[in-house]
């Protein structure tokens, strides 16, 4: 199975905000320690994404992780694949920061030397991004030396769990605030969710002519309330 794509709630929606899971598949590889040499060959448990969403008690041995396809991975030793993902991700973060810094220097000085640095750092961080995103494709390629269907499926099923988990949690969060029982996630796709914040805006912003005020309000809610809540929710998962 591939990624989870929610059937969109059709119609015209006001005040839509989106939240992305940063480098989802590489982070899942790191989170579950997914690698050919960490995969346990014991019989996989009969488990589904729905079971995990319902909070069914899992029988997971010590020092192991289990993906939603029932595959087990040892955690007493870090696999080569998550190690590689971590190194590539850290390098990308470093060069992306350098690129942004060079962009700021160019804005301040208009010195063309920073244009070359911007291009160089951007090329490096994009190369790291492509390498990160290729890991899942490689592990799911039957002609790849380390091909393993259980690992590839473990990645996509874990992605399904992650996006559906946060969809449920965000709906719970907004319904609790607004005292409603609605579906505020109008769409989700692989690693992104789209929320309609119209009812929250209507309840909070009273002025008829408050476009900038509303945008600032939503920016603040997203950064100071929803993003920390998303982080906390994934810690619980």
Residues of each region from the PLM?
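Conserved acidic
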Residues: 1-237
